[in-house]
């Protein structure tokens, strides 16, 4: 639908928020359809850095509990009624918070080997945890093929 509107001269800004694999997908499609514009798309995707839960995105619930994002309600880093948000947010002595700030070093499997890690940021860690009970396991909702995630490396598998 977005492409159809764009082709009709009615460009729309589209925000996808629950699967950061959409970024590489859109870039790869743009590379085929409009290589010049694909460069701009890639720069924007790199600037955004994909999922930013625990870094650029956070959630303060109604009771003051601080979470990595709105989906991490089962894990609190502290309460703004007891400590300032800035203190809670920058406290990397809490293991999960520290790792979320530098999650590229902790993701496993195909996420760790993915050439798009700088673009998607490892996708949703909370979804990986919900399915595998491991925050750092690959996000099960990543629909990119092994070939697509290895394109920048010139390989064909990310096992």
Predicted regions and their residues:
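C-terminal accessory region of radical SAM enzymes
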Residues: 1-40, 65-122
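Conserved short histidine dyad/triad with adjacent acidic residue
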Residues: 41-45
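Short C-terminal domain-edge/linker segments immediately following a structured domain
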Residues: 47, 88-91, 99-100, 142-147, ...
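Short, acidic, Ser/Thr-enriched surface-loop or helix-capping motifs
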Residues: 60-61
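Cysteine-cluster motifs in flexible loop/terminal segments that predominantly coordinate metals
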Residues: 105-154, 158
């Amino acid at each position: 639908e977005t492409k159809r509107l764009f082709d009709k001269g009615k460009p729309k800004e589209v925000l996808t928020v629950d699967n950061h694999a959409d970024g590489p997908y859109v870039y790869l499609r743009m590379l085929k359809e409009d290589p010049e514009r694909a460069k701009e798309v890639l720069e924007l995707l790199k600037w955004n850095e994909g999922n930013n839960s625990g870094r650029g995105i956070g959630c303060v619930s109604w009771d003051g509990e601080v979470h990595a994002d709105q989906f991490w309600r089962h894990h609190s880093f502290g309460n703004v009624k007891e400590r300032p948000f800035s203190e809670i947010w920058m406290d990397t002595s809490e293991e999960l918070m520290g790792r979320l700030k530098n999650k590229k070093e902790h993701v496993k499997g195909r996420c760790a080997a993915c050439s798009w890690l700088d673009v998607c940021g490892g996708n949703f860690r909370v979804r990986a945890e919900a399915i595998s009970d491991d925050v750092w396991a690959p996000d099960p909702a990543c629909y990119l093929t092994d070939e697509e995630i290895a394109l920048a490396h010139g390989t064909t598998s990310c096992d």
